[in-house]
Amino acid sequence: MKYLAKKLAGFVMTMLVVSFLVFAAFAVIPGDPATAMLGTQATPEKLAALREQMGLNEPLLVRFGSWAVNFIQGDFGTSYKYQMAVRSMIAEKIPVTLTLTAMSFLIMVAVSIPVGLFCAHHAGGKVDRIVLIVNQVIMAIPPFFSGILITLLFGLVLHLFTPGGYVSYTTSVTGFLGYLIFPSVAIALPKAAMAIKLLRTSVLSEMKLDYVRTAYSRGNNTKGVLYQHVLRNAIIPVITFLGMARADMVAGSIVIEQVFNIPGLGRILLTSISNRDYPVVQAIIVFIAFIVIFTNFLVDLLYQKMDPRITLD
């Protein structure tokens, strides 16, 4: 249990440090939160009373402690611009972004694993060479540009979806999921291309090791050796990459949400930044950081399960 306890402690400490850095960064940004909430026409007495109420006169560490306790309890603060609870503002946005990134991840895995194995099994063949060329092109295209191309081709030319025709999950779940397919593809494509290349390289490297020759000597064919012996070892670095990609998709979805007019965390984050609505920005950044750190934590645990050289003791 030492390995699990160590990773869990690391997760908590990392989350604590990241939260403090985010809180401290917004604390030192020029501007008065009380003035932002009451406006420049507020009297000095009202401003002073609000500062006292918000605890702005307390030391930074004391303020962070109060904020962290409230955050854990679900109180993310109050929006400067809209004078409403941040929690209620982002509550409906979180499922949108999480669904988008989950679909992107599933598409990435569904494409990269079979294609990577096929290319490794037929290395040097015509299909393998074509996939390698296509991979290089896809990896060179930023996700937002992929989103624009997908919108032009599948939305405006082929009319497979209506650009900007987002359907809320509260209105129609099938319509909601259907609209997210193409944005998910835009996010997944570059990551899938990288995973294909990594898995192909990893499999080919494993195929050169002694235990593979031993497996062949026992009468196994290439397909049997690949799936029964090589894949378990070759996929370990790919799992690490997939975990990192899953975490990166949460941040990468911000731009894609703008391209496809999806009202997720990305839109409200950019709007809040332009409005200097720091409590909203702060809550979203900490939430994204939590998803990234928690994903890496799960990947570490899965890595231990896949690699027998790492023990829980």
Language-model features, listed with the residues they occupy:
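Alpha-helical transmembrane segments of integral membrane proteins
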Residues: 2, 90-128, 172-313
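Membrane-water interface segments at transmembrane-helix boundaries in multipass membrane proteins
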Residues: 133-197
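Transmembrane helix irregularities
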Residues: 29, 138-141, 250
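Hydrophobic residues within alpha-helical transmembrane segments
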Residues: 5, 9, 13, 17, ...
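An internal, D/E-rich "acidic patch" concept
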Residues: 57-113
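Hydrophobic alpha-helical transmembrane segments of membrane transport/permease proteins
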Residues: 15-65, 158-179
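Hydrophobic alpha-helical segments of integral membrane proteins
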Residues: 8, 46, 50, 60-76, ...
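Cytoplasmic-entry segments and transmembrane alpha-helices of multi-pass inner-membrane transporters
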Residues: 1-10, 114-150, 238
